[in-house]
Amino acid sequence: ISTNPGASTSHSINRPTYSLQDVDGDGYLDIVESEKESELKVTRSAIGRTNMLKSVTNSLGGTFTLDYAHTTPTYGLPGGKWVMSALTVDDGIHDDGPVMTTAFEYKDGKRDRHEREFLGFGEVITKNLDTENGNSVYRQAVENYDVANYYTQGNVTATSVEDANGNKYTETKNRYDSYYLTADGDKYTFAKRDVNLWSDRASAFVPLRYTANLQYEGAANGVVTSEAWNEYYLNGYHGELKSYKYSDKGSLGEDGNGKFDYATAIKYTDNASKHIFDFLLM
């Protein structure tokens, strides 16, 4: 009689103890370490502003100094972006006024996931600082951009000059039209779109249609001081400027059908046999 009893057991746990991850969202990899489940150690990347221009000095002793910051990552702009946050200008002559410092703020950054391209920031605020009074803001310029899609990126929708509390002095508003266009030889066909442009294959034309300048000067509502309206040659042409209307009475309107002070009509000539177009005729 022979008996050979036996038993076997094993137990194993696998987990990473070291990895490279962007923990703080600054666009650079950090070192992440963990020797036990209750502890996590992060060594942050120190690259930051490395190799970004810091200052320039001219032959007369004047300098300008740049500073940078990383924007907060958002759904629209994952990972954020390194941007210029401040500019200090010193002309080297200190008896003619204080050093000038300008700070910059960026909002509504957009990265198009489909195009894999950065479309810009929806709002950029340029702040003039009082360097003799604790760097307090005394004036700011606000610029708004259309970052809705690839075709409209970079179009300025509004600009304004404001005081430190956001009360406007002046404002400019822009309105654009949107067209899909198709080409038949040298002739284009334009199809107007009133919604966001979106296509993998189509070409688009997004011209400036209307501009209004407003004056506030402390009031809650602005007064229109001037307007401009543009019309373009479309089907059968190439989107050339056709006419321009101007009014300083505030009566023109976004459709261009109101009263105006003067209008300019533009005509072009071409040499179609040689595919040469858009020569200004009058």
Regions found by a protein language model. Give the residues of each.
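Non-catalytic interaction/targeting regions
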Residues: 1-282
